[in-house]
A protein has these predicted regions:
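Short, Lys/Arg-enriched N-terminal segments with co-localized hydrophobic residues
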Residues: 1-4
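Hydrophobic alpha-helical targeting segments used for export or membrane insertion
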Residues: 6-18
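Von Willebrand factor
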Residues: 21-141, 143-148
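P/S/T/G-enriched low-complexity
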Residues: 23-29, 190-192, 196-243
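Extracytoplasmic/secreted cell-surface and envelope-processing proteins
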Residues: 35-41, 75-80, 153-158, 204-207, ...
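Well-ordered, non-membrane alpha-helical segments in soluble/globular domains
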Residues: 40-53, 125-133, 165-181, 209-219
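VWA/integrin I-like adhesion module and closely mimicked acidic/polar interface patches used
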Residues: 152-211
Length: 243
């Protein structure tokens, strides 16, 4: 009888989130000159109303490790900030309830700090791939990555805003992946679930609704080639199953 009981306890331990250390979440958000101010305000609203409240609900049963990092024209070397909630096993319930509120306030304050710094530096371009590469290097374990950006990589690697790319052709997308491998190296997204929200069709003829399905295919293929999985893609974080 002892063997089945031991196996059951081991199974239980492995499935209790707080016994496996913090759950890792990373939020990468387009800031500085990578997105207009009103768009950044929209991302902040998404964080305040659609993302952070859902993450905060986990705090009473799970230790959460949240990394916030900007997507800019120099995403790979951009500073990141880490917030970690208390271990629920060793923290009184009333303190965990307080931690839920503190966590959300600190995350928004951190967003504002990162935005201020990114605006001051104002590096042109939108390096989503560089941000994903940095996120992969920060990851300590299986985790979840939320990208808040319009979806258009604009860097030395490529300009997805260019409708002449013919991105709907698989061979074109594969050629871009080969360029990423050669110049930067693919991100290491093994065991990472990625969700991209904030997607837009753009404001002019270069970025129209016909282009966006091809851009989704590109990101899906890049993330898969990097060992990760694209689990959500759309205009709002509500498409992300891990929230």
């Amino acid at each position: 009888r002892e063997a089945p009981m031991t196996a059951w306890l081991l199974s239980l331990a492995l499935n209790l989130p707080f016994l496996g250390g913090p759950q890792e979440y990373q939020i990468l958000v387009a800031l500085g000159c990578s997105a207009p101010r009103h768009v950044q305000n929209g991302y902040r609203e998404m964080l305040a109303h659609e993302v952070l409240p859902r993450l905060a609900e986990k705090v009473t049963t799970t230790q959460v490790r949240l990394t916030l990092a900007p997507i800019t024209g120099r995403s790979y070397t951009a500073p990141a900030r880490v917030l970690e909630t208390p271990n629920p096993l060793s923290t009184p319930r009333f303190q965990l309830e307080e931690a839920k509120q503190t966590f959300q306030k600190e995350a928004l304050r951190t967003f504002d700090e990162l935005r201020k710094r990114a605006a001051a530096e104002c590096s042109r371009g939108t390096e989503i791939i560089g941000a994903l590469k940095a996120a992969g290097e920060r990851a300590r374990k299986p985790g979840r990555i939320l990208v808040l950006a319009h979806g258009f990589e604009q860097s030395e690697l490529m300009n997805l805003y260019d409708y002449r790319l013919k991105l709907e052709k698989r061979e074109v997308r594969q050629g871009l992946l080969q360029r990423v491998k050669a110049r930067l190296g693919l991100p290491n997204l093994k065991d990472q679930e990625v969700c991209i929200a904030g997607i837009t069709a753009g404001n002019d003829n270069n970025a129209n609704a016909r282009l966006t399905p091809s851009i989704k295919a590109f990101w899906e293929e890049l993330i898969q080639a990097s060992g990760g999985r694209l689990v959500g893609y759309g205009t709002t974080p509500r498409v992300c199953p891990f929230l």
